[in-house]
A protein has these predicted regions:
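Short, ordered, surface-exposed loop/turn motifs in non-cytosolic proteins
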Residues: 21, 28-43
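A short, amphipathic beta-strand motif
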Residues: 21-27, 54, 90
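Structured extracytoplasmic
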Residues: 108-280, 286-294, 356-457, 461-464, ...
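Short, acidic Ser/Thr/Gly-rich low-complexity loop/linker segments typical of extracellular
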Residues: 45-55
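Exposed, low-structure sequence patches enriched in small/polar residues
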Residues: 251-253, 375, 385-849
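A short, solvent-exposed loop/turn motif at the edges and junctions
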Residues: 41-43, 65-78
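Short, acidic, small-residue-rich periplasmic hinge/interaction motif at the N-terminus
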Residues: 26, 70-73, 85-134
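Short Pro-Gly-centered beta-turn/loop motif in secreted/extracellular proteins
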Residues: 31-35, 57-64
């Protein structure tokens, strides 16, 4: 989507008001910029500060003294007059300043926490948190208004002189000065949410009721445009400094008043001053290592017994290891309520971003206001149900009167005119052709009309290869909710040019709840019938992507064990808002071995293999699965639904029953599987993802119905799969697997000279598989030599030693060029097997902050 604006929008601007003084604050001796310099008029309680790059902007007041102060520098006061320029370069002289036996200077010196008054004060502030926590009340509630604006940032005024740009008055009218950074921006989307937030102490429960939602902007131009708002909301979440850890940019940041703050940050007392008539201690802080994921900023602490935060400013250190973020600024203000307590009422955030320096820059502005705090009893009926977030049925259909009453922050002129801007943009000459191409690239589908009833795709499955078909072509399509909001059809026709075979898939979906575009939108409540005839590798089922994806068609080993399958499946899926998903399936399937795979019963041992008939099996089964993941969030693409937030745990439990004699089923069997996934954050040491799985095949079955490892045969990294296990290499009827991955987030590299400038991130992993095959399913035992149920194992399939789990180790470097992840994989054991490959390199392209 960003490329769309690079192609269409030249950076645009308009002149700033002459009633503002702006400039930069620098060190007199070194010329370095001085971040977070206090900027205020004398005798004025309002405190401003320069940003992380030393830039400042403040209202012009002729005849008053403007004061600049920073830790370790001599305070400077300047009389503002008519001749004072609008652009200023302020130089501050370094000094050594003693604060109650603690020396603070601009030169690097040893920081001591012992006998440090700033540290002692912060210990008292942290200890006082529990006393002032609103959750001490039995009940409380408040209203919240939040506005999210996404815009092109830092537009160059010189480019307005371009003749083509001058002709686009509708575009020039959309440009405005951002009040937070005084740069010219071009707003592209705005999202508003009004909610009521409820809290009950006993039994503890919290609810967020979404009363109103309003979204307009470039996300309306593409059907999966909700991805933009969903990702922005998850990345730039609400910040509560009273939490020990603050989740931001999908990472945990140590709060400056969290339990670990004393060890993580360095604190300095700046001054004692008044903020809105309240006497406050003014402190500054920064991380011990500025490349760690932490904040730099200022705190204003009430100089009374509450020691509550009155105001805070948070930003990222200049040397931060965070990707794509040029500047982040958070300003929060707390207000005293009628009962004397303090509550958060203002929470503003701006994030200035760029993928690479020479490309278009962007800004996200999140404006939040909390109001109407109340502590009266809330009726129990308001807390019914397990869903934490409840949507008013009419939340997206609120009228202007609702927004006039609940919009506590006015829209800017550009935000108000967003609809007309998008309309003008969509009617620009050549725009439709560019949009068509970009949508096909971004969404992997081609729409067949402006309001598409049928989409063609996925595009990346149209051409692929495999061992049986050689070259394979495929044409796929799916209907959308524009045709029927409750009923969906999809399918494909494929041709294998070497095998001369034709393949198909047809799917009918009925959704009990109305959908906006695709049937898998949350919550999914559907009945689905699918009929498929195709060819596959047994390991294909472990891949989250389409098996015909051209990018995963390149394998590190020859995949010649394959089978044709003819499958009919009826499924019912029902998701609850609070995270529980129930799935019931009925399936009948016939598999015919092909390639180097044979389904040969032991009772036919010694018979000659007929290349035209390598064996078939048919199964009929019913399965039941429960999946629970509280707080999980998603984005919808045209191909599938993707997780956004990986912090919530995931629990799954399933059981499958095979029935002989029903719809031609040849076998009775019972398969039980369970899994747990959990992410653990280690503060500045990154995160550890742990996935544990286990399963049992309870009955005697032929090898196609045994449990095979989740083998990833491509060069592309896929989560929770084994990279060096071959196709069907191990066959078990009992197994347990453990997948542990540790993303150190640059903790070690950031402390190595030169390497730390690359901003690489370390990644370690270990994957273990324990498996066993009970005697009843072991075809190599003499007692099973003529068993009519069991089959000979394929060549290259082996039995594991139950006392020796398979282990592979992974060491990787992530964040290469902020995009490329490279992993080296080493197979620790079972290397004497003919199919074993000891080492491998896997890659992945993934953008992370």
């Amino acid at each position: 989507m960003k490329k769309l604006f690079i192609l269409l929008l030249l950076t645009l601007t308009q002149t700033l008001s002459a009633q503002v003084i702006k400039g930069i604050v620098v060190d007199e001796e070194t010329g370095d910029t001085i971040p977070y310099t206090g900027v205020q008029y004398k005798n004025d309680n309002k405190v401003n500060a320069s940003d992380s790059h030393g830039r400042f902007s403040i209202e012009r007041r002729n005849g008053e003294y403007l004061t600049f102060s920073a830790v370790g520098y001599t305070t400077l006061s300047i009389l503002i007059g008519p001749n004072t320029p609008d652009e200023m370069r302020i130089t501050l002289k370094p000094e050594t300043k003693r604060l109650k036996e603690v020396t603070v200077s601009t030169k690097r010196s040893k920081y001591s926490r012992k006998n440090n008054p700033a540290v002692e004060l912060m210990k008292r502030v942290i200890a006082a948190k529990k006393r002032t926590d609103l959750s001490n009340h039995d009940y409380y509630q408040f209203n919240k208004y939040q506005k999210l604006t996404f815009a092109i940032n830092d537009i160059n005024p010189l480019q307005l002189e371009n003749e083509k740009t001058k002709k686009k008055q509708w575009m020039l009218n959309q440009i405005e000065v951002c009040q937070y950074n005084n740069k010219l921006i071009l707003p592209l989307s705005v999202d508003e949410t009004v909610s009521q937030n409820l809290y009950r102490k006993d039994p503890k429960n919290e609810k967020t009721i979404i009363l109103g939602q309003n979204t307009t902007g470039v996300n309306d131009l593409i059907q999966t445009g909700d991805i933009l708002n969903t990702v922005i909301k998850d990345v730039f979440t609400d910040v509560d400094i009273y939490d020990d850890q603050i989740r931001l940019l999908q990472y945990p940041f140590t709060s400056p008043i969290g339990k670990d703050a004393i060890d993580f940050y360095r604190f300095y007392i700046v001054d004692t001053l008044y903020v809105d008539e309240d006497k406050c201690f003014h402190l500054q802080f920064l991380p011990n290592n500025q490349q760690d994921f932490g904040f730099r900023g200022e705190l204003w602490i009430l100089a009374d017994s509450t020691l509550h935060v009155k105001k805070c400013k948070l930003s990222l250190p200049k040397k931060t290891d965070v990707n794509f973020t040029d500047n982040l600024s958070i300003v929060q203000e707390y207000t005293q309520l009628p009962n004397g307590e303090w509550a958060l009422t203002t929470d503003d955030m701006i994030v200035e971003m760029s993928v690479v320096k020479f490309m278009t820059k962007f800004i996200v502005i999140r404006t939040t206001r909390m109001s109407n705090y109340a502590f009266n009893k809330i009726p129990d009926k308001e807390f019914k149900g397990k869903a934490k977030i409840i949507y008013d049925p009419n939340s997206k259909m609120k009228d202007d009167d609702f927004w006039a009453a609940n919009r506590t922050v006015h829209l800017t002129n550009s935000e108000r005119s967003m609809g007309s801007f998008i309309n003008s943009l969509s009617h620009t000459k050549g725009f439709k052709i560019i949009l068509f191409g970009l949508k096909a690239l971004i969404e992997n589908y081609v729409e067949t009309s402006k309001k598409s009833y049928v989409d063609i795709g996925p595009i990346n499955t149209m051409i692929s290869t495999n061992f049986i078909d050689g070259l394979r072509t495929r044409l796929s399509a799916q209907t959308t909710a524009h045709l029927f909001p409750h009923f969906f059809m999809s399918g494909y026709y494929a041709r294998g040019w070497d095998s001369k075979k034709n393949y198909y898939k047809g799917q009918l979906v009925y959704s009990f709840n109305k959908k906006e575009y695709m049937p898998w939108e949350f919550p999914k409540r559907t009945i689905t019938f699918t009929s498929t005839y195709d060819v596959c590798s047994p390991s294909d089922k472990f891949m989250p992507t389409d098996k015909d994806n051209v990018f995963t068609a390149f394998k590190w080993t020859e995949v010649n064990k394959m089978m044709f399958y003819n499958r009919q499946e009826l499924s019912f899926e029902y998701e609850q808002y609070w995270g529980l998903k129930t799935t019931i399936k009925l399936k009948t399937e016939e598999n015919e071995a092909c390639g180097s795979l044979f389904f040969k019963p032991l009772s036919l041992n010694g018979a000659t293999n007929d290349a035209m008939s390598q064996g078939r099996i048919r199964t009929t089964e019913a399965s039941f699965q429960l999946r629970y993941s509280p707080g999980e969030t998603y984005v919808n693409t045209k191909q599938r639904r993707l997780r956004v937030n990986f912090d919530p745990p995931v629990f799954t439990l399933s059981h499958t029953v095979g029935v002989k004699g029903v719809l031609g089923g040849d076998y009775n069997y019972n398969l039980t599987e369970a899994s747990i996934y959990k992410r653990f954050w280690l503060n500045s040491w990154g995160k550890i993802d742990v996935a544990v799985k286990g399963g049992v095949q309870w009955n005697k079955v032929p090898f196609p119905l045994l449990i095979m490892p989740a083998a990833n045969l491509s060069y592309i990294v896929e989560d929770e799969t084994f990279n060096l296990i071959n196709n069907m290499e191990f066959l078990n009827d009992r197994y347990a697997s453990l997948d542990i991955s540790w993303d150190l987030n640059g903790k070690i590299f950031n402390r190595i000279p030169l390497i730390k400038k690359l901003k690489w991130r370390e990644w370690l992993g270990v994957r273990c598989l324990w498996g066993t095959l009970t005697d009843k399913n072991n075809p190599t035992l003499q007692r099973n030599a003529d068993d009519p149920l069991l089959m000979q194992f394929p060549e290259g399939s082996y039995i594991m030693d139950p006392k020796r789990p398979y282990i592979e180790l992974v060491a990787g470097i992530h964040n290469i060029f902020k995009l490329l992840h490279v992993q080296f994989v080493h197979r620790l054991n079972y290397n004497s097997l003919p199919t074993a490959k000891r080492n491998g390199v896997r890659i992945m392209l993934r953008l992370t902050f």
